[in-house]
Amino acid sequence: MVTIRLARGGAKKRPFYQVVVADSRNSRDGRFIEKVGFFNPTAQGQAEKLRLDLDRITHWVGQGATVSDRVAKLVKDATAA
């Protein structure tokens, strides 16, 4: 099953997440199909906190991909802003 979820990157105590489309059987930070955005929870000042390609996310959801709880919340926040 294909899922849209967060893949963690960044340094220790400084998380940075890529929003990726991946097979649910692959590991969290492992192989993915496509990057559809990023989320930087520690962004300060003028730094960009969230960027999502909503067209690609809706495409993958239309193809049957499931969305993780956290990504669903991020998409909701992005569409409201």
Curated annotation (Swiss-Prot):
NCBIfam families: S16. Keywords: Ribonucleoprotein, Ribosomal protein. Belongs to the bacterial ribosomal protein bS16 family. GO terms for biological process: translation. PROSITE patterns: RIBOSOMAL_S16. GO terms for cellular component: cytoplasm; small ribosomal subunit. The gene is rpsP. This is Small ribosomal subunit protein bS16. InterPro entries: Ribosomal_bS16, Ribosomal_bS16_CS, Ribosomal_bS16_dom_sf. One of its GO terms (molecular function) is structural constituent of ribosome.
